[in-house]
C-alpha cells in the first residue's frame, strides 16, 4: 500500500474508532462488539507501524499505552484544587444555603440558584489542553501540587485527546490558547468486578475508588489501558468565552467531547435541593458506577471568586454525603472457607436482602474472636453494613429480636474441602487444615498467591482458570505452571487458542520478575512482601537461604525467631524442594540481581508505618514510595519507629505513636516529603 492510500484509510479508521468510543462511553449505545472494536484498532496500529510518519498525538492508537514511567514529575496547579466541605446532614446543607444567600446579598446579587450534581466516587484530576490538544494531566495531590500522569490518562477513552469544536468563542480560545478541565476518574462497577475476578481473593481491591487510585499511579501505561476507567468532567476554565453559569459550562464541556454528570439539575431553593437528594438516595444504586453523595455549586460562576474560599474548601460549594447503608437480615448459617495456608474462615450465610442496590446473601465473620465479640448465633437477626467495601460486614446483633431457638456457631473439626482433621496453632484464634500437599483449596490459594500482583503478577491467571487446572490435575504447585502446554490450556472451559497463548506469554514474562518477588510468591507463612525484600538482601540465593539456620535467619532485620522457624519449616518440606527444582529448571530468578537505584534519599534512616485509610494512595504503593527513597516499612509501632503516616480513622497504632512520642504526619505532609 502506498502512503496516500494508507493516509486515507488511517483517517477513516480514526474517525470510526472515535465514533465508537463516543457511542460506548458518552452515549451508552454501543453498535459493535469489543472484538470488532479491537480489530479496527489493530488495523490502525498496523498501518501506523508501517507508516510511522503518519502517527499523530491525538490518534486512538496513542491510548493503548506501553511506556514505563519510572517516576511522576510534580505539577504545581495554577489554581488550587480544593476539596469540598462534606456533610451528612440536610440541616447543614440548609445552613450552607443561608450563608451563601447572605454572601451573595452582600455582593449586591439576587436570590442564588444552585446546580445539584451526583458526587462520583473516584479520583480528581486536572487536564490541560493547548491549541485543542491534550498536553498534560495530573492528580489533585495535596491541592497545591500533584503528580503528572499524562501517559496514564491518555489511555482513558472518555478523555478526548483533541477537543471537539463546541462552536463559539470558547472553542476558539481552546484552539488558540489553553483550557483546563477538571473532573473525576472512576471505574464502572462491571469493569471493577472484571478486574477483581482476575485477582486472587487476598489481592482484590476493596472498592472501585481504591482500584482507580491504584491504577492511576501504575508505572506501566499498558496495564492502565487494560484496566478500563472512565472520566466525568465538572469544571472548565479557558481564556475567553466561558459561559457565565456552571450549568452552561457543563453543556460546553459536553460539546467539546466530555462526559458530564447526566443528572445535573438547576435548583432554586432548599426544597428543590432536598428533593434532589431524596430522589437519588435509592435511585443511585441503579447507576453503573459508584456515587456517594450530591455536590451543590452556586450556579453563577462570576460570584465564585468573590465568595472566595477557606484554606481547604470553596465557600460556593458543598458536598452532601449519603450515610453508610445498613439493612436487617437473618443469619441462616455459617460456611467455612479454606485459605492458602489452610486457615479456616467463617462466612455468614444471610437471608437475601437488598443493600446498597444489590442483593446480599453472604458476609465475612473474619474469625472466631469476631463471632464471640458480636455474640452472634445462627438464627439471629443481624444488622449488616456496606460502607465503601465490596463485601458487607455484620456490625451488630438485634438482641431484642433474638428468636427462642438459635444455635451456637461451632468450629468445624474437619476441613470442609478435603476432610482432614483440623488443628490449631498455640495462641491463635483460627483453626487450620494441615493437609498442605493434598487439600485442593490450599493448592488453589497458593497458586493464586504466586500469580498475584505483588508476587509474580501473572496476568490472565484468575480464580476460575486455576480451579480448573487443579481439578484436572494439570498443576499441583506453582512449579507445574511452567510445564503447561497450549493444548492443556485450550481444553479448559472458556479458553481458546489465543487465550491459552496469552497465559503462556504471561508465564514467560513472569520469569523476569525479581528474586525478592519470587520469595514473596512462594507463600511462606509470616513472610510478607517487605520481609521478602529483607530476606533477598540478606540471602542472595535460594540455595543460601535453604542452608541458613534459625539463629542466622533470626538475625536478619524484621525476621526474629517466629518467622525464622517458619522459613526453616517451609524449606524442610519435600514438596517444597520438588517445586523449587521445577522453578529453577523453568528459569525463575533463584538469586538476587542488581539492586534498583533509589529515586532519592528523603526517607533514608526512617522506619515508617502507615495507619488508617489513605485518600490518594493505595497502601502498598505508598510503602513502595518510602522504600524507593531509602526508608524502611515496619509492621508495628515501637520506640524504633521514627515516622507514622496517619490517614482517616487511624486507630490503636496512632494512639501508641502519640504515647511514645513518635512523629506523626498526614497524607499531605507525606506527599511533600516525597
Curated annotation (Swiss-Prot):
KW DNA damage (keyword) present: yes
Similarity remark: Belongs to the NAD-dependent DNA ligase family. LigA subfamily.
The protein's Enzyme Commission number: 6.5.1.2
Keywords: DNA damage, DNA repair, DNA replication, Ligase, Magnesium, Manganese, Metal-binding, NAD, Zinc
Catalysed reaction, written as an equation: NAD(+) + (deoxyribonucleotide)n-3'-hydroxyl + 5'-phospho-(deoxyribonucleotide)m = (deoxyribonucleotide)n+m + AMP + beta-nicotinamide D-nucleotide
Entry's Gene Ontology BP terms: DNA repair; DNA replication
Record's GO cellular component terms: cytosol
Top-tier EC class: ligase
Pfam families found in the cross-reference section: BRCT, DNA_ligase_aden, DNA_ligase_OB, DNA_ligase_ZBD, HHH_2, HHH_5
Matches recorded under PANTHER family: CHROMOSOME TRANSMISSION FIDELITY FACTOR 18, DNA LIGASE
Gene that this sequence comes from: ligA
Record protein name field: DNA ligase
Positions that bind NAD(+): 34-38, 83-84, 117, 140, 184, 297, 321
Domain BRCT, residue spans: 598-674
Amino acid at each position: 500500500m502506498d502512503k496516500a492510500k494508507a493516509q486515507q484509510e488511517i483517517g477513516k479508521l480514526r474517525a470510526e474508532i472515535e465514533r465508537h468510543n463516543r457511542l460506548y462511553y458518552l452515549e451508552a449505545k454501543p453498535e459493535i462488539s469489543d472484538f470488532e472494536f479491537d480489530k479496527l484498532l489493530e488495523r490502525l496500529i498496523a498501518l501506523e507501524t508501517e507508516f510511522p510518519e503518519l502517527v499523530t498525538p491525538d490518534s486512538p492508537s496513542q491510548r493503548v499505552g506501553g511506556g514505563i514511567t519510572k517516576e511522576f514529575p510534580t505539577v504545581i496547579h495554577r489554581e488550587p484544587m480544593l476539596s469540598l466541605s462534606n456533610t451528612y446532614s440536610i440541616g447543614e446543607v440548609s445552613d450552607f444555603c443561608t450563608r451563601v444567600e447572605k454572601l451573595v446579598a452582600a455582593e449586591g446579587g439576587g436570590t442564588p440558584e444552585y446546580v445539584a450534581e451526583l458526587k462520583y466516587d473516584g479520583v480528581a484530576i486536572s487536564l490541560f489542553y493547548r491549541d485543542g490538544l491534550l498536553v498534560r494531566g495530573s492528580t489533585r495531590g495535596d491541592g497545591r501540587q500533584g503528580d503528572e500522569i499524562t501517559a496514564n490518562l491518555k489511555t482513558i477513552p472518555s478523555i478526548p485527546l483533541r477537543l471537539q469544536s463546541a462552536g463559539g468563542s470558547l472553542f476558539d480560545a481552546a484552539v488558540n490558547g489553553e483550557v483546563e478541565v477538571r473532573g473525576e476518574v472512576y471505574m464502572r462497577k462491571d469493569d471493577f468486578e472484571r478486574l477483581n475476578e482476575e485477582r486472587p481473593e487476598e489481592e482484590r481491591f476493596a472498592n472501585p475508588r481504591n482500584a482507580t487510585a491504584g491504577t492511576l499511579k501504575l508505572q506501566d501505561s499498558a496495564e492502565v489501558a487494560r484496566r478500563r476507567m472512565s472520566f466525568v468532567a465538572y469544571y472548565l476554565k479557558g481564556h475567553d468565552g466561558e459561559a457565565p453559569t456552571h450549568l452552561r459550562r457543563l453543556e460546553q464541556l459536553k460539546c467539546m467531547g466530555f462526559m458530564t454528570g447526566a443528572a445535573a439539575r438547576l435548583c432554586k431553593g432548599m426544597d428543590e435541593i432536598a428533593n434532589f437528594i431524596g430522589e437519588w438516595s435509592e435511585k443511585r444504586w441503579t447507576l453503573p458506577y459508584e456515587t456517594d453523595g450530591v455536590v451543590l455549586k452556586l450556579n453563577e460562576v462570576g460570584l465564585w471568586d468573590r465568595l472566595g474560599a477557606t484554606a481547604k474548601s470553596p465557600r460556593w460549594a458543598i458536598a452532601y454525603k449519603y450515610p453508610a447503608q445498613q439493612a436487617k437480615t437473618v443469619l441462616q448459617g455459617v460456611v467455612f472457607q479454606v485459605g492458602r495456608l489452610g486457615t479456616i474462615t467463617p462466612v455468614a450465610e444471610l437471608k437475601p436482602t437488598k443493600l446498597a442496590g444489590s442483593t446480599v446473601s453472604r458476609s465475612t465473620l473474619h474469625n472466631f474472636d469476631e463471632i464471640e465479640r458480636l455474640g452472634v448465633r445462627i438464627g439471629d437477626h443481624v444488622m449488616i453494613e456496606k460502607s465503601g467495601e465490596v463485601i458487607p460486614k455484620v456490625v451488630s446483633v438485634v438482641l431484642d429480636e433474638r428468636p427462642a431457638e438459635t444455635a451456637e456457631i461451632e468450629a468445624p473439626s474437619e476441613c470442609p474441602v478435603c476432610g482432614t482433621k483440623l488443628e490449631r496453632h498455640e495462641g491463635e484464634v483460627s483453626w487450620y487444615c494441615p493437609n498442605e500437599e493434598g487439600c485442593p483449596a490450599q493448592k488453589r490459594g497458593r497458586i493464586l498467591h504466586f500469580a498475584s500482583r505483588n508476587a509474580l503478577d501473572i496476568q490472565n491467571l484468575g480464580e476460575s482458570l486455576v480451579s480448573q487446572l487443579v481439578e484436572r490435575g494439570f498443576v499441583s504447585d506453582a512449579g507445574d505452571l511452567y510445564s503447561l502446554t497450549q493444548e492443556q490450556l485450550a481444553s479448559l472451559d472458556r479458553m481458546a487458542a489465543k487465550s491459552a497463548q496469552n497465559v503462556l506469554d504471561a508465564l514467560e514474562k513472569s520469569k523476569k520478575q525479581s528474586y525478592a518477588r519470587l520469595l514473596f510468591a512462594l507463600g511462606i507463612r509470616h513472610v510478607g512482601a517487605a520481609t521478602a525484600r529483607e530476606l533477598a538482601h540478606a540471602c542472595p540465593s535460594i540455595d543460601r537461604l535453604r542452608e541458613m539456620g534459625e539463629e542466622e535467619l533470626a538475625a536478619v532485620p524484621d525476621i526474629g525467631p517466629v518467622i525464622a522457624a517458619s522459613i526453616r519449616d517451609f524449606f524442610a518440606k519435600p514438596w517444597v524442594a520438588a517445586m523449587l527444582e521445577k522453578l529453577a529448571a523453568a528459569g525463575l530468578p533463584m538469586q538476587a540481581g542488581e539492586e534498583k537505584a533509589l529515586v532519592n534519599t528523603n526517607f533514608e534512616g526512617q522506619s515508617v508505618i502507615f495507619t488508617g485509610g489513605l485518600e490518594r494512595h493505595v497502601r502498598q504503593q505508598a510503602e513502595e514510595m518510602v522504600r524507593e527513597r531509602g526508608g524502611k516499612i515496619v509492621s508495628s509501632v515501637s520506640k524504633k519507629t521514627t515516622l507514622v503516616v496517619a490517614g482517616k480513622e487511624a486507630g490503636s497504632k496512632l494512639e501508641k505513636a502519640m504515647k511514645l512520642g513518635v512523629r506523626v504526619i498526614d497524607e499531605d505532609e507525606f506527599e511533600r516529603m516525597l
